[in-house]
């Protein structure tokens, strides 16, 4: 990190212009000045009357190390000789009201382990990265036409030691990475790792945006974890919260005694539901703080993506009864995405947005917000409501399973089965399923089959892969003992086979963002709650037929219209006995019958299992058959697919 002497910085660079290396000015930097080694402290506090640095090195005496104000707009700085890395410190701020308050450093790179709240001097230089091969691989294969399976996890509750203590960043290399590799996830998405005081905020209410939480080790330890993930071909996505922050007294809130990082207007400052305050995204210094922070994580931790939290809350003012968009947030998000993609065009910027805001994943130069992915919250809500409904009544809400294809190509979507849906009394995915014990497992297998065959990249929260029975308990680890039970082992085996099938099957991801990648066979069989469709790859022969039965009935000799290939093989059946099913499978090769059905040139007759998904693959083209043309009924979109930037 190249530290810039703040006295040499033009005021406009931080206060009025785009300046995305703020971390080189602010914070605590181990430096040598006039041949004397020490630490330079720099902070922005525009309404402070006076500033000091306090810590163990001066017995927390406010009078000893007074800072110098170096710009009229409130940049303060001080070089303290002969102190070293590892010193704990805070800023003592004399407010306009004459009070002295203690604050952690907004740009601190390291902090004390909670419940202590001081910042820690840390020299971030020195880690030697070994991930050049990973970087080359990313550039060679952009994600838009590749398989993408994201494992979302909470670092502190995935697994704990026998005594209940947390695994460190370095220890998780041995615990987590082999597990992720075994399950063939392409990425992990970690809930926020910025410093935060309250465990149960899960990291979403941060105080130290530049500090990797010390709960799990040092910043260099986290770098090692990311480096090892890249070594084994795993991308690392971080949850990042640029919209709001917590009100703890040592943090950013009323930093110099006045609203500094947050809006001044109380009507838009507060988030009463979360107990947080909103960043003032119209203030240049705040934008520089946040965008510098994003680039800091990219440059120093080699992060591969951000899931940007609570975008909906940013896009709209939270004044009661007001639907007006927040133009500060809109322009900030565009500026953020432009800066990120200028740094790394292969980065993943995913919006967690539940609104119908248009063009979220359209580049800014085409009038969009500039993200390249968006969580498909509509799909998630509709599908889970459908699955929670008693099977005999699903025919009355049939449209919940078909509606998503009307807008599936309006954005680049990720399908999230996320932490939000398995907490706060919502039940686990397994326990959402109606019916008896067997029914629950059968329907979860069915849900996963539909999930992996529906257009869009995939995200699953930890525990779902083996059928966690209880909802997520953030103070405990996952119920790993469930592997002692046969049905959970079956579920785990099924999930691993399903994700392996997904990764080796181009039709399931190659045209995720193009209408040509999906075609309904029959979307209208609400009476039997059966859905059938085709997933298509770039080549004609890269096609799969998917049939999903959302009732407990078994159907034999069921006609399914198919493209004209001579034979089909069933390559996965969720009802197979090895997955805990009843064994209603199609073992034999299925010969097509050259009679049109479901607007297809031919059809096959299959057994459809109870609560089952059957995936069929064509074996060979019929001799003399013509290439499929565009006459088949396809899902159309009036929005151009944006599968690349």
Swiss-Prot record:
Catalysed reactions, semicolon-separated: Transfers a segment of a (1->4)-alpha-D-glucan chain to a primary hydroxy group in a similar glucan chain
Pfam families per the UniProt record, alphabetical: Alpha-amylase, Alpha-amylase_C, CBM_48
Keywords on record: Carbohydrate metabolism, Glycogen biosynthesis, Glycogen metabolism, Glycosyltransferase, Transferase
Gene Ontology molecular function: 1,4-alpha-glucan branching enzyme activity; cation binding; hydrolase activity, hydrolyzing O-glycosyl compounds
Positions with biased composition (Polar residues): 636-645
Active-site residues from the entry: 309 (nucleophile), 352 (proton donor)
EC number annotated for this UniProt entry: 2.4.1.18
Annotated region (Disordered), positions in chain: 619-645
Highest taxon in the source lineage: Bacteria
Pathway participation: Glycan biosynthesis; glycogen biosynthesis
GO annotation terms (biological process): glycogen biosynthetic process
GO cellular component terms, A-Z: cytosol
Subunit structure: Monomer.
Family membership: Belongs to the glycosyl hydrolase 13 family. GlgB subfamily.
UniProt function note: Catalyzes the formation of the alpha-1,6-glucosidic linkages in glycogen by scission of a 1,4-alpha-linked oligosaccharide from growing alpha-1,4-glucan chains and the subsequent attachment of the oligosaccharide to the alpha-1,6 position.
The protein's name: 1,4-alpha-glucan branching enzyme GlgB
Organism: Bacillus cereus (strain G9842)
Lineage: Bacteria, Bacillati, Bacillota, Bacilli, Bacillales
